Amino acid sequence: MKFFALFIQRPVATTLLTLAITLSGIIGFSLLPVSPLPQVDYPVIMVSASMPGADPETMASSVATPLERALGRIAGVNEMTSTSSLGSTRIILQFDLNRDINGAARDVQAALNAAQSLLPSGMPSRPTYRKMNPSDAPIMIMTLTSDTFSQGQLYDYASTKLAQKIAQTEGVSDVTVGGSSLPAVRVELNPSALFNQGVSLDAVRQAISAANVRRPQGSVDAAETHWQVQANDEIKTAEGYRPLIVHYNNGSPVRLQDVANVIDSVQDVRNAGMSAGQPAVLLVISREPGANIIATVDRIRAELPALRASIPASIQLNIAQDRSPTIRASLDEVERSLVIAVALVILVVFIFLRSGRATLIPAVAVPVSLIGTFAAMYLCGFSLNNLSLMALTIATGFVVDDAIVVLENISRHLEAGVKPMVAALRGVREVGFTVLSMSISLVAVFIPLLLMAGLPGRLFREFAVTLSVAIGISLVISLTLTPMMCAWLLRSHPKGQQQRIRGFGKVLLAIQQGYGRSLNWALGHTRWVMVVLLSTIALNVWLYISIPKTFFPEQDTGRMMGFIQADQSISFQSMQQKLKDFMQIVGADPAVDSVTGFTGGSRTNSGSMFISLKPLSERQETAQQVITRLRGKLAKEPGANLFLSSVQDIRVGGRHSNAAYQFTLLADDLAALREWEPKVRAALAKLPQLADVNSDQQDKGAEMALTYDRETMARLGIDVSEANALLNNAFGQRQISTIYQPLNQYKVVMEVAPEYTQDVSSLDKMFVINSNGQSIPLSYFAKWQPANAPLAVNHQGLSAASTISFNLPDGGSLSEATAAVERAMTELGVPSTVRGAFAGTAQVFQETLKSQLWLIMAAIATVYIVLGILYESYVHPLTILSTLPSAGVGALLALELFDAPFSLIALIGIMLLIGIVKKNAIMMVDFALDAQRNGNISAREAIFQASLLRFRPIIMTTLAALFGALPLVLSSGDGAELRQPLGITIVGGLVVSQLLTLYTTPVIYLYFDRLRNRFSKQPLMKLE
């Protein structure tokens, strides 16, 4: 009593406390970063190694395997996957979520150092690593185009000037340049001219390397002057290399220009980028973990004038994709929902209490509780994102509950003629324990969620903490500010202006009287009520089993990714044309705003596209509907497939795939894997629950297989290393020298001229000069024939692996898809030597699916324990928890009605319902117990009176929670697919539970009271 009086009788102190909470919240709000979802930093490290010209199998056996053995010993590695393709190996290490990324990076560096001695000596550089976050998509993509500058020059400007400046922008972590490669001097050899002059390819390489060196020449100290010695030991342009003497033939010099075409070009001619139908260089910008996306994008945009001024005017620098507009729009929609929810909740209070002054009290309490939460969010390192703002929207219905319970009880005393100060003290004392029980038991629901491991736990931690803090602040406000305002603002016997809306009071009274009659019947027919309750429990089980399930709602971020997979033997020139054709088809769709793409590099038959859709206000279709529409048009393109998927803010796993979900086949025997992968892929492609089924197993690439005649080689004085060097020099785009410039370093690249690299018959023109100076054609000691070879070799752990990727058809669910895949594997009879397992998002979904029921049970158990402690009873918590089955039925039926799958968002809605619907029972049980202890009446009479007495606050709090969630159900625009499942679950659960628990709770109370009387004759204890 004294505690409450302290705040009621000291209005200035209470007001200043409220202002302090509000001001701290406003400051916290201004400092909070902005992002689409809570930051989940998966500790992922990518190791890269290169050996230009090496085939995938060589890269896998000589580079990937030694590295995997060393890296596999690192503690905390959850998954290790590798892809070896032409000249490169990429290894992805995914660590435990709790592993420190910096410590993991040190371990990776140590492992790379240990493996260095096991790697081939021909590697141009040591393996490197970088940290990465697979779930963090680029925040911006820029393009450089020009009618006058070459692609190499554009790439040079992009990497040397623009990327450096952009990377220095606050919030930017990495800028990747693609679509071409750095400028280089290319030496395109003519095999016929070399043969005629008697010059070997390796002699040309050695001559170029020896002619371009950078070594210190020292200095000279004269008597009065210090002289630096500088020689023209470097050649920096193609023009400088052309007259270089590479050989003497009968005393006459053979110059490089006599046997080769020397041009200024690029390091890798098999790289191409496109934007808006013309060649382009791409700048892909990523943010730092936890950085404010909107602020970072704004900073980059502010730098655009300076960036454009730093490059020639004939180069166009444009933004092809910007992630911030959809984030801004989505957060604006959530904030709008929050404001609407607050307004609706306050309207509920006004309708029921019919007093402007009384309505003012929750109108102050609700914003203060919500605003104060921002301070705690900032201190916890959270961000303003869809989930944290959804938590505040839902919290609107929760935080007003405490104020409503206190306000309604005080108003009841005022209506009875009690003076305001006395009514405030008496009213808050009567319901103080009730409010405390409601708040603590509601927060207890989130304890299992806070302890949940893995991605879901990290993802919803902000949601749970934000909601819990809002409830905690609301508890403080409802027990301090609310009674103080009641004492100083409200009056006994309110009259006057409320007469005009008194009609609603009559309606409410009539409803209450009707409820009293129906409750009286229910208490007289308890068996029928119990049948209904047991039926809801059974219906819960059936609905949960039958409802389609998915991991996370399919988002429409306004961005799509396209992955091209062409015939494995396709040439680079044909691949460029495929990219252009696909970009034209996609760009012609009315919902598409821009398309940017690139192809080349180590994957010769693949390409990628970044697609931006028009804002939702300018298109009628969702991203998934656009994909479905384009799928039919894209299927008509021969020789290649384009797989489209909507970019999601949540992505799990570091492996590259052409679709959203992955199923990986593992085998110790590569032959068994190659035998069964096509069978499994064909079976999965027939499943209607899957779409865009494809595989990363590409073992049908065209290869010219050479067989050396070692006896002939020994007789001719040629060893295998010389023959291999010949092929590498001719076809490997071999980097043979480095050109040092003030801002960058460039390469001298040697291979045969393009007309020879595009025709396998050029092998007939290759030759080696043996130790006797004789020119020996390759055909003298080698035979070759066409064969198939892998374009990539994939490992998971130390096993050969092949990943089958798939998307979901429009309206499909992940649970149906995974179940169909498992059935197909069983029906195929795949041997035990070939193992299948879901990977990435599909794997996390299956793990989450197994833990969902345990999570719900843990939440119920936690609430039971908390209520048992609060009520000093084993039985009364069960009475309160009997409200849950009806809420579950309502939530699941609502999801079925709206054709929404059961996702993690819906699971959170169920968790919230556990906390919400028990409030009704708490209010009933509290007053019934108090009446039994102090009024000396029967349990039936006590629960009947409590139900009628608390009918108005029960209806008010339920409607407040319902209206708080209603804006989420009715939301549209960006991010609605995240908000709607939560709102649907809560509204459906509230409606059904409100109808049933008004009857089931009193009946359960009676049953347990009879049970208590049967086993114990002691009267109820009075709890102080």
Swiss-Prot record:
Keywords: Cell inner membrane, Cell membrane, Membrane, Transmembrane, Transmembrane helix, Transport
Compartment annotation: Cell inner membrane
Membrane-protein topology: Multi-pass membrane protein
HAMAP family in alphabetical order: MdtC
Descriptive protein name: Multidrug resistance protein MdtC
Pfam families: ACR_tran (PF00873)
Lineage of origin: Bacteria, Pseudomonadati, Pseudomonadota, Gammaproteobacteria, Enterobacterales
Molecular function GO labels: xenobiotic transmembrane transporter activity
GO CC, alphabetical: plasma membrane
Transmembrane feature ranges: 12-32, 333-353, 360-380, 387-407, 435-455, 469-489, 528-548, 853-873, 875-895, 897-917, 953-973, 984-1004
Sequence similarity: Belongs to the resistance-nodulation-cell division (RND) (TC 2.A.6) family. MdtC subfamily.
Gene from which the chain derives: mdtC
Known partners and oligomeric status: Part of a tripartite efflux system composed of MdtA, MdtB and MdtC. MdtC forms a heteromultimer with MdtB.
Main location: membrane
